[in-house]
Amino acid sequence: MRELRGEEGGVEERVPTGARPVRALARSPGPVPDHGQVWSPGVSRRLLARYYLPQRHTTLQGNACRLLRDGVEAYPEMLEAIRRARRSIRLETYMFVTDAVGELFGQALAEAAERGVHVKVLYDAVGSWTSRRSFFEGLRQRGVDVRAFKPFSLSRGLRHLFRRDHRKILVVDGTVAFTGGVNIAAHWAPEGQGVAWRDDVLKIEGPAVHELERRFLATWRMMFQDRLSRLRRRIRGGVSAPEPGPQRGDVGLAVLSSRRSIHRAYLHAIQRSRQSVLIAAGYFVPDRRLVAALKDAAKRGVEVSLLLNGGKSDHPFLEHATRAFYETLMGAGIRIFEWQRGVLHAKTAVVDGVWGTIGSFNLERLSLAFNHEVNAVFADPRLGRELEDSFRTDCGDCREVDLAVFRRRPLWQKAVERVLYFFRKVL
């Protein structure tokens, strides 16, 4: 692996084609307009990575990536990979619910273990608190090494309770990986006429798979090996995982598992935006630096649009805290779209149709200060365009918030928003 350390002056900048100043807030709902291409097609992906990604981030070139929408698209691909596994399966998830989807995955994992595949499953004890213990015990009896991340204990205090494993990683045979916002639960692929939670998963083949597997193994060993064993491993050279596989495509990816590095990647890309910043966030309670970066981008004439929950969130208190930011953001020219088809759970962003990120990181306090997270970050025109098209399509199922109408909301609603904003760090 080699870290790309391009200088800021080393990237030839071009005037964005078709760029437009931020318009006055639209009075009627409508899709986010497509402003066209920012970069010349001749600009290399390596130069784009140098421009949009902080210098300290290691970018792995040569990946093949596919964007999967909701569990309806992601689960069949994940299950097929598990059923084809021959050597190893690593599954890390916040929620492993013992419903129809959980049973389906459990059966596939157990069958893999029974045919000799080395299967490790790490689920978060709090995120999966409703799941039956007998389900996981049944997996163990069939050969699956399944363990809970930090079961709650009163003796360990609230800080231990807040530090959760929020990652979603599946790595099979060291050759294919999946990461994004989708857990293992029927929320993302309901039976009958139910509406799936809106989310995204990135399927990866290539050198970046190694990095996701390495992150999984580091967490596993941190949690379940004694201190002496961990010390010996550090002396021998750290966490081992299969060497990176051959190149499968042309996408450069950085795998970020530090909370601060993910936050820094967001800020860096927004500050360098030239035409558009499109963020889909199921949970959005931004810190001051992110608010300032978004407002500054809008003042520069960059199109800034947010896709947020619209009254159907699984965390309604957090949604009220989010609305405390609306006037400030819309007053700066930022457009806000509220998702109307069920729960929005996505954690994606795309800048200039080039830089993008998909992962588990939410733009709120728990992800920034406590949780274990992982995001894939890329600078690729094809994948960026695909993510941007998905965002713009989703806006067709949204209600755009009108600033004048929003200001006339009831006084009690304003009071609730302010109170919950005050407690935003613990929601």
Describe these PLM feature segments.
Residues 2-5, 10, 14-427:
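Charged, low-complexity intrinsically disordered terminal segments
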